[in-house]
């Protein structure tokens, strides 16, 4: 199995990937280092593919990875509607890509490296 270690042990790396994937689903765009973006892209593409499937097994598999965070809060009449990241994945993000076979994300390099260690920075966003 090939993957980037990113300088962390497995539990820290998995937690970082879960968090960044969840933030990508919620915000649809994140700024990070190039190495992290390439790893997050892999997990995000898998989650969107699960969202496109939409069956119970896919929902459970995605729920095991995507963090239970609030993605959107809005009012409908007298009620306040709260949408989680998982709900946004299955109801908003995945249907957008129903006719697309992969390639749901885009990595664009930023001109200025990170101050401090000069790490190459990129923007990872949903297409």
Swiss-Prot record:
Q: Which cellular component appears as one GO term in the record?
A: cytosolic large ribosomal subunit
Q: Name the keywords, alphabetized.
A: Ribonucleoprotein, Ribosomal protein
Task: Tell me which Gene Ontology terms the entry assigns under biological process.
Answer: translation
User: Which InterPro entries does the UniProt record give?
Assistant: Ribosomal_bL17, Ribosomal_bL17_CS, Ribosomal_bL17_sf
User: What GO molecular function annotation could you give as one example from this UniProt entry?
Assistant: structural constituent of ribosome
Superkingdom field: Bacteria
- Keyword Ribonucleoprotein carried by entry: yes
Q: Which residues form the signal peptide?
A: none
- Subunit structure, briefly? Part of the 50S ribosomal subunit. Contacts protein L32.
Family statement drawn from the similarity comment of this UniProt entry: Belongs to the bacterial ribosomal protein bL17 family.
Protein name stated in the entry = Large ribosomal subunit protein bL17
Which species is listed as the source?
A: Lactobacillus delbrueckii subsp. bulgaricus (strain ATCC 11842 / DSM 20081 / BCRC 10696 / JCM 1002 / NBRC 13953 / NCIMB 11778 / NCTC 12712 / WDCM 00102 / Lb 14)
Q: What is the lineage of its organism?
A: Bacteria, Bacillati, Bacillota, Bacilli, Lactobacillales
């Amino acid at each position: 199995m090939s993957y980037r270690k990113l300088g962390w042990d497995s539990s820290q790396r998995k937690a970082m990937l879960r968090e960044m994937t969840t933030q990508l689903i919620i915000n649809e765009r994140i700024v990070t280092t190039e190495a992290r973006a390439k790893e997050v892209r892999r997990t995000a593409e898998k989650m969107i593919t699960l969202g496109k499937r939409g069956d119970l097994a896919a929902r459970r598999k995605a729920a095991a990875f995507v963090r239970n965070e609030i993605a959107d809060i809005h009012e409908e009449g007298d009620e306040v509607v709260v949408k989680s990241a998982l709900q946004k994945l299955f109801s908003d993000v995945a249907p957008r890509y129903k006719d697309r076979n992969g390639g749901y994300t885009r990595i664009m390099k930023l001109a200025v490296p990170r101050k401090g260690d000069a790490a190459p920075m990129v923007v990872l966003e949903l297409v």
